[in-house]
Regions:
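Short N-terminal micro-motifs specific to bacterial/archaeal maturation
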Residues: 15, 30, 39, 65-66
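Alpha-helix C-terminal capping segments
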Residues: 13-16, 26-32, 57-59
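A short, surface-exposed loop/turn module that caps and links secondary-structure elements
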Residues: 22-48, 76-77
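Enriched for short, Lys/Arg-rich terminal
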Residues: 2-4, 22, 50-53, 58-77
Length: 77
């Protein structure tokens, strides 16, 4: 499946430390498998848990990574 990144997601990846960055990239390559949950209130929005980070993405025939946030920020909504 094709994977695209929003500008916000690219910026977030650039700020993450290398050990976490490697884990995040590996998890994204394995999408849509992994610890994925559908976000309530959205038709095609999901989140992937990778350690202390949450990868937010949409799935509409392709996967678009919309944001990558630390757990606390992702849970605030």
């Amino acid at each position: 499946m094709q994977i695209e990144y929003s500008k916000r997601a690219v910026k977030a990846i650039s700020k993450i430390n290398n050990p976490f960055k490697k884990n995040i990239k590996e998890a994204i390559e394995k999408l849509p498998s992994g610890d994925v949950r559908k976000l309530k209130g959205y038709s095609n929005a999901y989140r992937l848990r990778v350690g202390r980070y949450r990868i937010l993405f949409d799935m509409n025939g392709k996967i678009e990574i919309t944001d990558i946030l630390p757990r606390g920020e992702a849970c605030k909504g």
